[in-house]
Amino acid sequence: SGQWLVGVDKFFVDLAAKLNELRELFEPLADETGKTITVEGEGVVAGDSDMLRRAFSNLLSNAIKYSPDNTCTAIHLERDSDCVNVMITNTMSGQVPANLERLFDRFYRADSSRFYNTEGAGLGLSITRSIIHAHGGELSAEQQGREIVFSVRLLMD
């Protein structure tokens, strides 16, 4: 899983700036259904800016696609000793999948009957996890009530 991502050219990436760029990009789509996106916190990591943009774009796109109208997708960054943690939290429409780990499997789509008007091959989260792993990071998902939280942990250098 992720062998195709051989090397990562690492430069300093301002994640807050990158996530705010993505927020601006996705806002028109979110506005159509009364959804909002917030970004709080800061953090700089060593990584490939384009690859990280793709990973976070996948996460944000899914958050907007699979959340009910008039809800907020909250992105929170926090630094600890050697890492930046990014939490992307949104309300789920329908039932949260029983096994969240499966969301990262290639071609897996959680109960397609819930997502009758969505497109996708089920590769986005698998690719996202590969990108995060190529950066020496971790990606996980957990349920908190009606919300799902995707957590990304990336090294600062």
Where are these regions (language model features)?
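Short conserved segments within the C-terminal catalytic ATPase subdomain
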Residues: 4, 29-39
